[in-house]
Every structure is written in C-alpha cells, then in structure tokens.
Amino acid sequence: MHYWGKLLGLIFGVVSGAGFWGIVIGLFIGHMLDRASVRGNQGFFANNQSRQLLFFSSTFQVMGHITKSKGRVTETDIRLASQLMERMQLHGQARIAAQQAFREGKEPNFPLRETLRQLRRACFGRSDLIRMFLEIQLQAAFSDGQLHPNERTVLFIIADELGISRNQFEQFLAMMEGGRNFGDGGEWQQRQYGGYQKAAQGPTLADACKVLGVREKDDATTIKRAYRRLMSEHHPDKLVAKGLPPEMMEIAKQKAQSIQAAYDLIKKEKGFK
C-alpha cells in the first residue's frame, strides 16, 4: 500500500503550524512521494524481468557455444543438454526458447564476448548471480564426465569477461569437481559404451572440502563460516529476487542441497556440530 508519503505529509503539515494550507501542501508532497515510489517499484520489476530474460537466453547460448567448441555436436551432447533442461523443469515455451538459444550459441559467428559483457552489465553488483552463471556452465561442460581442452578455453574466456580471476576460476572448478559426488551436476557419468550410471565411489572428506572451498585441516569456525556464506549465496529466493530466472531455481536448490550434504559429511568426519 502506497500511502506512507501522504501520512508523513499530513504529519508535516500539522506540525508546521501553517494551518489548512500547510496540511494541503504536505498532502500534495506526500502524494508525489507515493507516486514516485510506485514508479520506482515498477522500474525495479521491469529491470529484474529483463535481467531474468537475458540471464536465461545467455545461459543456453553460451552452453551451446561450449558444446560446439569440442567440434561436432553429437546426439549425446544434445541429450545431455535436454537432461539439464529436465533438471530445470523446462516445458512448453520455456523449453522451446532454451533450445533456440542453444542453437544460436552453436553458430560460428556467435558473439560470445559481447553476450557476456551484456550479462555482466545487467548483473552489476550481483556477484552471486555471476557465480551461478559460471557454475551452470561448468555443470554443462562436466555433464559428460570430462572437460575437453576447448571447453576449458571457452570457460577461461567466460571467467575473464565476467571479471572472475584465474585463481577464483580454479577454485570454482575444484568445487565443481568435488561436488560431482554429491549430485551437483555430475550424478550421472558417461561411460565409453554410451550408457549412464551413478558414480561408484561415494563422496569423501576431500570432496566435501572442495565443495565448501576449505582445507581438511581448517578448524570448525572456518568451515562453518564458509558453509554459511555459500548457503547465503545460493539461496534460491534471494537469487531469483536478484535476477535468476525462476526456471533455474531448481538448480540453485540442488546446489544448496549439495553444499548441505558436503557440510554434513565434514561435520561427521571431523566430529563437530
């Protein structure tokens, strides 16, 4: 409800001692403040919706570009992209839009750097959104169980254009590798015979520490701090409010579950609550 401006204007008019006209002027000023507030909120939602649309299209365009970087796009690549869309629960028009964006990214003249620069401008001041974008691309690159040298090169370009240092990128890469045993984009691995099965080896303490970006020798305070920071950065509702498309909320939830599972394993192995 947008009446706080009028209420404050009324109070100002009364306490000003200017009588009837003081109250009228106060109400008028308050009315203008309320209108400005409404326009500001409309602008926020319009900008946020635009940011979500750009994030959505850029995600699948860049994903298609990464896939194409290996050379020919195989049926397996397309199937893996479809599986990722299933994880996002994309159906109907949303799925058609994702498929079209994926095809655009495969084009030889796809403007990768300009696309990333537009995304970075749209996500200015929202580092957790940028991080989520990179994590989704890492999941896509790792979806077949391996990272092709050309995929790594494209990922370096992505990190560079999004303002992520090489050291930060390597940390994200290690966290992604550790998270694969926690169902974080790597629950299913391709074998040479073309089938898919769950990784036989269960997650280890080393894997869990990679997910949280900590060392096995770190104390409980350091580990808890890293856990809380990551959970805050991957909170689905917060990410959507900042511009993550609602269709991608499921990936954020799965990432948060992976972080939680890793933290629970560390607590169990190191014996703290």
Curated annotation (Swiss-Prot):
InterPro entries: DjlA (IPR023749), DjlA_DnaK_co-chaperone (IPR050817), DjlA_N (IPR007791), DnaJ_domain (IPR001623), J_dom_sf (IPR036869), TerB-like (IPR029024). Pfam families: DnaJ, TerB. The chain crosses the membrane at residues 7-31. Its main location: membrane. GO terms for cellular component: plasma membrane. It is found in: Cell inner membrane. Homodimer. Regulatory DnaK co-chaperone. Direct interaction between DnaK and DjlA is needed for the induction of the wcaABCDE operon, involved in the synthesis of a colanic acid polysaccharide capsule, possibly through activation of the RcsB/RcsC phosphotransfer signaling pathway. The colanic acid capsule may help the bacterium survive conditions outside the host. This is Co-chaperone protein DjlA. It comes from Photorhabdus laumondii subsp. laumondii (strain DSM 15139 / CIP 105565 / TT01).
